[in-house]
Amino acid sequence: MATDFSFFIYDYESFGTNPASDLPAQFAGIRTDADFNIIGEPVMLYCKQTNDYLPAPEAVMVTGITPQECNEKGIPEPEFAAKILAEFSQPNTCVMGYNNIRYDDEMTRYTFYRNFIDPYEYSWKNGNSRWDLLDLVRACYALRPEGINWAYDDDGMPSFRLEKLTKANGIEHENAHDAMADVYATIAMAKLIKEKQPKLFQFFFVHRGKKEIEKLIDTAEMTPLVHVSGMLGNYRGNCVWVAPLAWHPTNQNAVIVCDLSGDIDNLISKSAVDLRQDLYTKKSELEERGVSSVPLKLVHINKCPILAPAKTLLPENAARLGIDRQHCLDNLAKLRQSLDIREKVIEIFSEEREFEPSDNVETELYNGFFSNADKNNMAILRDLPAEKLAEHGLTFEDKRIPELLFHYRARHFYKTLNRAEQIKWQKYRQRKLEQSAVKFEESLQRLAEEYSDNPTKLNLLQQVYEYGAKLLS
């Protein structure tokens, strides 16, 4: 570990649940040393909202942050993104949050993408990395639960909600869903796990990057591994034994694994075509037809997955989680005897799933990587004064960039648009707002009924209503 290594623990609050289409409201972050002692000044930022976006009223009910507050306290998104980049890109920084791999990191990527910042470099360049405390907490519960007070929901299932865990462990966490409060709570939980289960912490810290994870995976021998993931269900502690079968045919960062507690006989006997159809069918529909789920899963080695040698799941913890180790070993033997299983699973994943094509360039982050030439020119764009953006004289290879630039200018430098561009933007803006208006109004009505006896929530809803009405007028 580098002598200047540090964690940067962070959290977003936002105006919706979709990082591709929803906007950030608040960012908070704190730098710590390797033992989670705070070594930097807290960073708290609000992001000004743009006039082509309606916030989800549900989000305001959770966070208590209104768009008016963001516009009063906030900075424009290009500046907001640049300040975050400055923190994230300090050398030997490990960026970490609580569910950041699936949410906050995606919010970062899309925010950077809209503002001509490379969406990925911050997490690997200059010795940098990322990690997610949520999956480490899940792994601790499943594999080494001693020393932590665990929280449970009303059904007796383990709950990994940060506010429940902090309460169970006597960690101060007022104002849950305020970004800075959540950052302090994340730091305290990380420190607790490192103190109570140092070996577990160290193993998964070392194995957070894809190079180290790759060393654990042996598809030739189908060497079993223990895997912990929120996709696997709280009823079994989000934990299974898996056998790695093959690398994904088109995504070099994904390995196809088999859940060894699943229906292996079906996997072996059914055709790839039928299995593929079942794989993308809702579990409830399969149950109605009396069909078992396909026990296949993709593990993405670039998303800090929790993988460890099978023996890490001790017999007593397997029993506690309801995992039948002998049944899993019997299934592993069946897989190893199946001559065509690898070819079959590769065939299942060879055909890409079809998704609705997007008509919004801002949701097309994953449509390809930018070339080095485009990245260099985007860096120039970010530094240009507003009046030079219209006639920048730069050439771009990627067709997304001119449209992104148009949106960027329209949102943040509207006066740089000519008359034709202003008309184009107003049409785009009107269409986008109208598409979300019905859902916005339905949410306001439903929440007003739900919180009819809560003056604080009703006041927030009134502010959101007024904000939306002004945009839609």
Residue ranges and their predicted role:
Residues T63-F80, E87:
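Metal-dependent phosphoesterase signature
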Residues M1-S6:
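N-terminal accessory regions of nucleic-acid-interacting proteins
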Residues E195, V206-L286:
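Acidic catalytic cores of enzymes that act on phosphate-bearing nucleotides/polynucleotides
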Residues D22-A25, R31-T32, N37-T63, F88-P198, ...:
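Metal-dependent phosphoesterase core characteristic of DEDDh/y 3'-5' exonuclease domains
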Residues E13-A20:
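Short acidic, Gly/Ser-rich segments with clustered Asp/Glu that frequently serve as metal-coordination loops
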Residues I9-D11, D259:
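Short hydrophobic beta-strand that contains or immediately precedes a catalytic carboxylate
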Residues P249-W425:
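Long, charge-rich C-terminal accessory regions
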Residues E421-S473:
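C-terminal non-catalytic accessory extensions
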